[in-house]
Amino acid sequence: MENLDALVAQALEAVQHSEDVNALEQLRVHYLGKKGELTQLMQTLGKLSAEERPKAGALINTAKNSVQEALNTRKADLESAALTAKLAAERIDVTLPGRGQASGGLHPVTRTLERVEQFFTRIGYSVAEGPEVEDDYHNFEALNIPGHHPARAMHDTFYFNANMLLRTHTSPVQVRTMESSQPPIRIVCPGRVYRCDSDITHSPMFHQVEGLLIDEGISFADLKGTIEEFLRVFFEKPLGVRFRPSFFPFTEPSAEVDMQCVICGGHGCRVCKHTGWLEVMGCGMVHPNVLGMSGIDPEKYQGFAFGMGVERLAMLRYGVNDLRLFFDNDLRFLAQFR
């Protein structure tokens, strides 16, 4: 008991000079733990007389409380200092210029799709959609495509089984609309389509927009005027347009639409293969067989249909020479179209 004051003084000095919370914990264990120096003094009380024991016990408890209070005070000081240092280190200098958030932009294919849809919705068309996984009937048979047609071959179409496939065009949306609606019908059908093809101008997945108009008294002149006006508005300048006779099973007569090359103005360049013309879409008057199979009287109603590749239009509008660039997710390329 003689060295109690010295032991307390030693403990208080050690606490005062502690630099972190871990050191404080070690001091607490050293002095106040189960085998701590102050705790061990309590075991010496048995050697004292009954008269001395209460007074000695009170002194030891006072000493322990003094050390514990010093520990608590020092711990609070250290934690406060640590918090202050952390706040100072993390302080934001509001006078510094901000780091601007990079803004995104619509993909060029999305921009092109929206541009096409906006034109046709302004002249009374509605947007129709359908499943990308189609059955053979809606993708081929209902469109007057016989079983021996090359489009049904495995090298052109992704088949799941003999009856289910990934649609090769958005024409099935037209069929489903004709089956569920009566004329007049005015729709455009945007969406993803799939074909077994991949090179600088083809992709196994690409976007297509097809259009359909069915009503009484519709002629090829209506089709011609619609397409010419669309191309003029889409490319924002008057362009020469020509219609070449062609063949599609679902239209009769059918035509391929060429427009004056937007790169060289029709003078001839590498893009148009020095012809001055670029093919942009196929079109024609809806075949009577297609109307009849969809429950529409071909004697009363006529209609026209057209289809165009969205990536093809985007390539021509933005001067891109490789279709695959649209799907490479290269931000350096995509940032040009913000």
From Swiss-Prot:
Any one GO molecular function term: phenylalanine-tRNA ligase activity
Major localization listed first in the record, in broad terms: cytoplasm
GO cellular component: a single term: cytoplasm
Keyword Glycoprotein tagged: no
Co-factor(s): Mg(2+)
Keyword annotations: Aminoacyl-tRNA synthetase, ATP-binding, Cytoplasm, Ligase, Magnesium, Metal-binding, Nucleotide-binding, Protein biosynthesis
EC number(s) reported in the record: 6.1.1.20
Record-linked PROSITE patterns: AA_TRNA_LIGASE_II
EC category name: ligase
Cofactor note: Binds 2 magnesium ions per tetramer.
Catalytic activity: tRNA(Phe) + L-phenylalanine + ATP = L-phenylalanyl-tRNA(Phe) + AMP + diphosphate + H(+)
Gene3D superfamilies the UniProt entry points to: Bira Bifunctional Protein, Domain 2
Example GO biological process: phenylalanyl-tRNA aminoacylation
Localization: Cytoplasm
Subunit annotation: Tetramer of two alpha and two beta subunits.
Database matches in PANTHER family: PHENYLALANINE--TRNA LIGASE, MITOCHONDRIAL, PHENYLALANYL-TRNA SYNTHETASE
Record family assignment: Belongs to the class-II aminoacyl-tRNA synthetase family. Phe-tRNA synthetase alpha subunit type 1 subfamily.
Name this protein carries in UniProt: Phenylalanine--tRNA ligase alpha subunit
Species assigned in the record: Azotobacter vinelandii (strain DJ / ATCC BAA-1303)
